[in-house]
Design a protein with these regions (language model features):
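Glycine-rich helix-loop-beta junction characteristic of Rossmann-like nucleotide cofactor-binding loops
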Residues: 66-72, 93, 134-137
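S-adenosylmethionine
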Residues: 96-100, 104-217
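Flexible, active-site-adjacent loop/turn segments at secondary-structure boundaries
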Residues: 44-45, 53-54, 83, 146-149
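Residue-level signal for pocket-adjacent positions within structured domains
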Residues: 41-42, 85, 195
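Conserved beta-strand/loop positions that form the S-adenosyl-L-methionine
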Residues: 79-81
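Residue-level signal for short amphipathic helical patches enriched in basic/charged
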Residues: 25, 47, 94-97, 146
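Conserved SAM-binding loop of SAM-dependent methyltransferases across substrates and taxa
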Residues: 83-96
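Class I SAM-dependent transferase core
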Residues: 1-77, 107-125
Length: 217
């Protein structure tokens, strides 16, 4: 039986206890980001209303734990940032890491720059409106992406942005290994050193995050 639209519960997810465990002293900024997404997400086409009941667990916390794979002082590019995932949750948690949110859509880029960065006072975040192909080459220690493209296509976009010895962090699901196999023929052309499936947040989150970590030569 099909669920009618009016029968769907779009109530924003209550803050789970894991939120404070993940964010600690930074929890207030995480809460404010949550509030901004609830206020503007559907109105500006940043997230669909169906995402509100899982906004903390599937989006904010799921993204934040990827910061475990980044070192202090590094420069991170988040490509196709959209509503800020995973870049903003990571940046809130790691003020000693610099982030560039790369987003081609004007409405989303403006929201990130004029609302999120300013209202959350994220001094470690800049917003670049444009496509990945327009970003500076060999400029970033780490490049992240979430729900953008299949891994082979993603690596063609992201690897050229990454410094020698840097890494691409792609948030993926159950087909991560299949996507790695499809990407292996690109290793020589894109100067890739290795692929690794990493699970982060497993000690805190009930549904940990799967990341494909690709190291560059």
């Amino acid at each position: 039986m099909n669920t009618r639209e009016e029968d769907i519960d779009y109530t924003p997810e209550a803050e789970p206890e894991e939120a404070r465990k993940v964010y600690g002293e930074h929890i207030e900024k995480a809460r404010k980001y949550f509030d901004l997404l609830v206020r503007d997400g559907d109105l500006l086409g940043l997230i669909g209303p169906r995402e509100l009941p899982k906004l903390w667990s599937r989006h904010i916390l799921n993204s934040a734990v990827v910061a475990d794979l980044v070192d202090d002082g590094q420069l991170v590019a988040d490509v196709g940032s959209g509503a800020g995932f995973p870049g903003v949750p990571m940046a809130i948690l790691r003020p000693n890491v610099k982030f560039v949110l790369i987003e081609p859509m004007e409405r989303r880029a403006n929201w990130l720059a004029e609302v999120v960065v300013l209202e959350l006072d994220l001094k470690n975040v800049k917003v670049l409106r444009g496509r990945a192909e327009e970003a500076p080459l060999r400029n970033y220690d780490v490049v992240t992406a979430r729900a953008v493209s299949a891994l082979p296509k993603l690596l063609r976009m992201l690897a050229p942005l990454t410094v020698q010895g840097g890494q691409v962090l792609a948030m993926k699901g159950s087909k991560a290994q299949d996507e790695i196999e499809e990407s292996k023929p690109l290793m020589k052309k894109l100067k890739l050193e290795s692929f690794e499936i990493v699970t982060v947040g497993q000690n805190i989150l009930s549904d940990p995050t799967t990341v494909v970590r690709v190291r560059l030569l």
